[in-house]
Amino acid sequence: MSEYLVTGGTGFIASYIIKSLLELGHTVRTTVRNPRDEEKVGFLWEFQGAKQRLKILQADLTVEGSFDEAVNGVDGVFHTASPVLVPQDHNIQETLVDPIIKGTTNVMSSCAKSKATLKRIVLTSSCSSIRYRFDATEASPLNESHWSDPEYCKRFNLWYGYAKTLGEREAWRIAEEKGLDLVVVNPSFVVGPLLGPKPTSTLLMILAIAKGLAGEYPNFTVGFVHIDDVVAAHVLAMEEPKASGRIICSSSVAHWSEIIELMRNKYPNYPFENKCSNKEGDNSPHSMDTRKIHELGFGSFKSLPEMFDDCIISFQKKGLL
C-alpha cells in the first residue's frame, strides 16, 4: 500500500478521494488551513480506516514552503485544493486567482524538493481550462490538446477558467523544468451526493437553484460529471503506469435550462428557478472528447439523472431540502 497526500481535504473532490484511498487500504495525509477546526474536518475522521491511516496537517495555498512537510516522504500527491465559486463582490484576485495559481506553484515547488521519493503528482484542473475559446463550437469535440484562451476568459469575466488555465500551464512548466511525473485530470462540473457537513461551492449553487434562492439559473452550457467518476479518474491517473498528460473527465454536456427541466420533472414540489441569467460567454455549444480516459480502462460515465438524483437525495437526507 502507498502513502498519498491529498491537498484541501475538506473540499468536495478531495474528501471523496480521501475516503476512497482509505477504503483501498492506503495511508493518507491531507492539508487544511486549520486542522483543529472540528466543525470542518470532523467528518474526515469518520471514514473507514481514518483513525489508523489519516493525518491532517496545516498548510496554506498562498504561503511558499507551506506544503514541504506534507509532501516529504509520500509516494504521490493529489493536488485538488482550489476555490471554485467566489461571490462577485469579493476581491477575485485575492480570493480566487491567487490561491489557484500561487497554490499550484507552491505545491509543485514542494514536490520538486521531494522528487527523489515522489512517484507522481495528479493535479485536479478543469474542463474550464479547455472549453473557454472563441472557437469552442467549431473545434468540438474538444480534446486534451485544446486550451482555454485567457483573453476570452478576461472578456467575459470567467475568472475561474482564467486562473485554472494559468495554474495548469504553470504546473506543466514546473513539472518539465524539475523532471516531475505529472498527470492532470480535467473534470467538468462535478455533481453528486454531499459528503461533508455543509454543501461546498458547486453543491451550494445546486441547492440554491432547487430552493429558488439564487434569483436565476446560470446561462451555462457545460459538461457534468458524477463525483464517483471523478474519484475513479484520479485514482486511475495516479496508479495506471500508462497514464500521462491531461485526461478529460466529463459525461453529458447540457445547458442549465435542461438540468432545471430534468430536476423539475422529478421533483415538482421544489421551487426551481425559472429565470435564466443573461450573462454571456459560458453558453457556447460544445462537446468533449473522452476517448483518452476510456483507452486507459475507465468504464462508462454516470448519467445526468443519476448524478442529480444522488445530489438531491443527499440534500433531503441532511435536511437541507
UniProtKB/Swiss-Prot annotation:
Instruction: Quote the disruption phenotype from the UniProt entry.
Output: No visible phenotype under normal growth conditions.
Presence of the UniProt keyword NADP in the record:
yes
Q: What SUPFAM superfamilies does the entry give?
A: NAD(P)-binding Rossmann-fold domains
Task: Give the GO biological process terms.
Answer: pollen exine formation; sporopollenin biosynthetic process
Determine the domain of life of the protein's source.
Eukaryota
Function noted in UniProt: May be involved in the biosynthesis of hydroxylated tetraketide compounds that serve as sporopollenin precursors (the main constituents of exine). Acts on tetraketide alpha-pyrones and reduces the carbonyl function on the tetraketide alkyl chain to a secondary alcohol function.
Arranged from A to Z, the UniProt key words for this protein are: Acetylation, Cytoplasm, NADP, Oxidoreductase
Task: Identify its protein family.
Answer: Belongs to the NAD(P)-dependent epimerase/dehydratase family. Dihydroflavonol-4-reductase subfamily.
Protein name per UniProt: Tetraketide alpha-pyrone reductase 2
What gene is behind this protein? TKPR2
Q: Any idea which positions bind NADP(+)?
A: 4-28, 40, 160
Output the lineage of the source organism.
Eukaryota, Viridiplantae, Streptophyta, Embryophyta, Tracheophyta
Q: Where in the cell is it found?
A: Cytoplasm
